[in-house]
């Protein structure tokens, strides 16, 4: 199986383009085009007492990416049941190359290096980390690659033999975009923790607020699940009526608020922790693409969340570290619920080179 990941990371485009003005006297600028520079400066203005801007134009990085995905399907009521699924962990490795705000990478699945095998998974992640704004775009599709991690079929049914069984009746496709605004952008740097394009020099925190959109599609073969249950448990188990569906689609619009903190615990070292909670309104759709419930319903509100954690050593030229992004989405109806947790864990080491004009003769931190 081949696992190819294309990562487009727009590393602080606004800050990188205007970084020179943060630590040197601004040169006279002609009126022509000066409005663009003022706009860029407005979006990337940071206090260099707190944040050291990028010194280089080019970057080279090696990164390992471990992907985690967990799904829990459950029903409610006196005959409530639950099944938890997750695929085998993916570990991918590859090089990345960047110029200022463009970062491109190519990774392969270390579990199977046969480049001619087709993977049942496809993942695309893109992130923008700028001084004032941030954005995430992600698409994930997993087809028949899940294993049962736990199951509850009733008080008198021992489901231990189901644990670890491969299940080829679950297909999941999820597409989403998140946009957020960083309030204390002059003193706090998200790129320092997750894009390695600046350095946080003094510990600092900030509140954030954002908007998000999510489109989720779940295909579930309940007949295959009943057959697998009989095969592994040696008895026929009837799935609850809430599980007897073939497809569920829902769209989610959310508003989020969160807090992030950059802790500079030693010279050139940084630890970042960020948590955001979102209130999302989800509208589900039936298999014939018609809305199940076209009217407003308070029960369609759910709580979602996203966490970002990172530790990095960066002296502006060399850097190394690890980061994790975890997302949690919840969908609840009167008889059925789906909970999804997925994320990436990254370990990387890299080099910046090609000093920018103002830093060609400057020593690193």
Residue ranges with predicted function:
Residues 71-79, 116-121, 148-154, 190-194, ...:
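Outer-membrane beta-barrel translocator domains and adjoining extracellular loop/strand segments
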Residues 176-179, 341-365:
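Outer-membrane beta-barrel "beta-signal"
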Residues 62, 93-99, 124-128, 177-183, ...:
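Residues on the lipid-exposed face of transmembrane beta-strands in outer-membrane beta-barrel proteins
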Residues 31, 35-39, 43-56, 184-205, ...:
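Short loop/turn motifs that connect adjacent beta-strands in outer-membrane beta-barrel proteins
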Residues 67-92, 103-117:
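Surface-exposed strand-loop-strand hairpins of Gram-negative outer-membrane beta-barrel proteins
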Residues 54-60, 91, 100-102, 131-135, ...:
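Outer-envelope beta-barrel architecture signal
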Residues 64-70, 99-103, 108-112, 130-132, ...:
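Transmembrane beta-strands of outer-membrane beta-barrel pores
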Residues 84-92, 146-152, 161-174, 218-230, ...:
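Extracellular/periplasm-exposed beta-strand and loop segments of Gram-negative cell-envelope proteins
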